[in-house]
Every structure is written in C-alpha cells, then in structure tokens.
A protein has these predicted regions:
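Short, well-formed alpha-helical segments that are part of the catalytic scaffolds
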Residues: 9-26
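Short beta-strand/loop segment that forms part of the nucleotide-sugar
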Residues: 27-38, 56-58
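Glycine-rich, basic loop-to-helix element that forms the pyrophosphate-binding segment
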Residues: 58-75
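Short aromatic/hydrophobic "clamp" motif used to bind/position activated sugar donors
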Residues: 80
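Conserved donor NDP-sugar-binding/catalytic core segment of glycosyltransferases
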Residues: 88-122
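A short, conserved alpha-helix in the catalytic core of glycosyltransferases
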Residues: 134-136, 140, 144-145, 150-178
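Active-site donor/metal-binding and catalytic loop motifs
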Residues: 173-193
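Non-catalytic, C-terminal membrane-associated alpha-helical segments of glycosyltransferases
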Residues: 196-204, 213-264
Length: 264
C-alpha cells in the first residue's frame, strides 16, 4: 500500500493507544503531535513496525484543522488515510476502501462502515459521513481545500462536508469495510482536556453559524447569561465537571468574540 499515506494528529496521547500505529505499518505514516517539544519522536519510531514514518510537532496546541492541513500538504502519495489513534482498523478494510476509490473517478473520499450492519449494496453515496477515518483522493481534496483553519477542533468536518456536497465530487460509505471507533480515547482524560474540548465545541459551533450565515446575536447573549449563572450554581452545589463545562462554554463564547474583533 505504498500509494497510501496515513496522517494522524496527536494531542496528549495515552500510552496504551500507541500500538494502534502499527495498523498502518504497510502505509507511509505522518504524525503531527501538538503541545510537545518533540521528545516522543524516538518512542513512536520504536513502536512503529513499518518502514516509513515522519514526525512533526508544535510546542503549542494549534488545533486539529491546522495540524491536519500541514500533514496533507506533505503527502506525496495519490491517496491519504486520515484517521485517529482511537480507531481500530485492519489491512483488509483499508484495501477495500482503496479498491472502491480507485475505480470511482468522482469519489473524493470514502469511509468504512462504523455500524457493522451488513447491507446488500457494496457502497452507498452519502451527504453525511463520519470523518474519524476516511480515505481521501489527495489531488481532488487539494482542489477544494481540506479543513478551514478558522475551526480549531470541532465542526471543521461538517463545514468540509457541506463544501464537498456543493462540489462535483461524492462521498461514499463502503458497507463491507468495518471499523471500530473508541470515541474520545485518542487523548488522555483530564479536567484540562475536557475543558479544551468543551470550549472548542461551542467556539466551532459559533464559527459554523457565522460562516453559514445562521449566527444570531440573541443566541450568543442567551447562551452567555444562562451559562454564567449555571457556572456559579454548579460550583455552589459541588458539581465540578458540570461547572467546568459551563465555564468552557463561556470561554468558547469569549474566544469567538475575540475572533470576530481580530477579523475586523
């Protein structure tokens, strides 16, 4: 599978998930790790049993969109497997994805079946797809552009999906290619990471509303006021995780407001 490059972005990955990198040993592997000084590079190269691995890093958390775009620009093969550390996939599944996308000139990306429900159709063209594991036709994706870097962690896939649906290209689910996604297990669990995820989900939602012209000022005001009071209520009732979530929503709104002012 030399004509496939696998790209994975990492942020505080759990040690027990790193063995999953060997699922891609027959492909070229590109890793981008965030918020690190690159000290883990040797560990990844020791774990990975394949021949071709390249490692990139940033000292700051620059977000999924930006780090993924950096990796896609470095891909030299015709096809690219965009995936995550908490995905379980085998070689047969990757080959099934490859066999379909090679034959269909209008397919920009294909996804395995996450539900494991057998269907008569070999593949289904769809307008909605799970972006956690997709095989991409690199040339086609470069024509329309990958992730919008105004998004940090969430909603970039939905925005890209809309862009693909407006293009001449199609997306498809390959029904006999199965994959397991142990969602939200690609990073260690901590209050800080929970806060970052929650903040950027709200931030991404507001960015999406802005770009699709669905944004309403009244929505932002209501969301801010509601979660401002709920934050203190959760603190007083000792519901720490819920209070972190409310604080993250407030943080996401403030991050969006800063984004708007910096864009002017």
């Amino acid at each position: 599978m030399k004509n496939i490059t696998t790209i994975i972005t990492l942020y505080k990955p759990p040690a027990n998930k790193l063995e999953n990198l060997n699922q891609y040993k027959d492909t070229n592997l590109l890793i981008f790790e965030q918020e690190t000084s690159g000290e883990n590079q040797r560990d990844y190269k020791k774990i990975f049993q394949g021949k071709n691995i390249e490692y990139f890093f940033s000292k700051k958390n620059i977000g999924l969109s930006k780090s993924s775009n950096i990796l896609l620009k470095k891909v030299k093969s015709k096809y690219c497997l965009f995936t995550q550390l908490d995905i379980k996939i085998d070689k047969k599944t990757i080959i099934k994805l490859l066999n379909v996308i090679k034959k269909k000139n209008d397919f920009i990306l294909v996804s395995p079946n996450h539900k494991k429900n057998k269907k008569k159709k070999y593949y289904e063209i769809t307008k909605n797809i799970d972006f956690s594991c997709i095989l991409i036709d690199v040339e086609k994706m470069r024509k329309i552009g990958f992730f919008d870097e105004d998004f940090f962690l969430y909603w970039e896939d939905i925005y890209l999906q809309n862009k693909i649906n407006r293009s001449p290209y199609k997306m498809a689910i390959i029904n006999n290619a199965f994959v397991e996604h142990h969602s939200s297990q690609s990073s260690i669990t901590s209050p800080k990471i929970f806060y970052i995820r929650s903040l950027n989900f709200i931030y991404g939602e507001l960015i999406y509303d802005l770009k699709t012209k669905k944004l309403r000022v009244i929505k932002i005001m209501r969301m801010f006021i509601k979660n401002f009071f709920l934050f203190f209520f959760k603190i007083l009732t000792f519901r720490l995780k819920e209070s972190i979530n409310k604080l993250a929503i407030i943080g996401g709104i403030l991050k969006f407001i800063i984004f708007i002012f910096l864009k002017k």
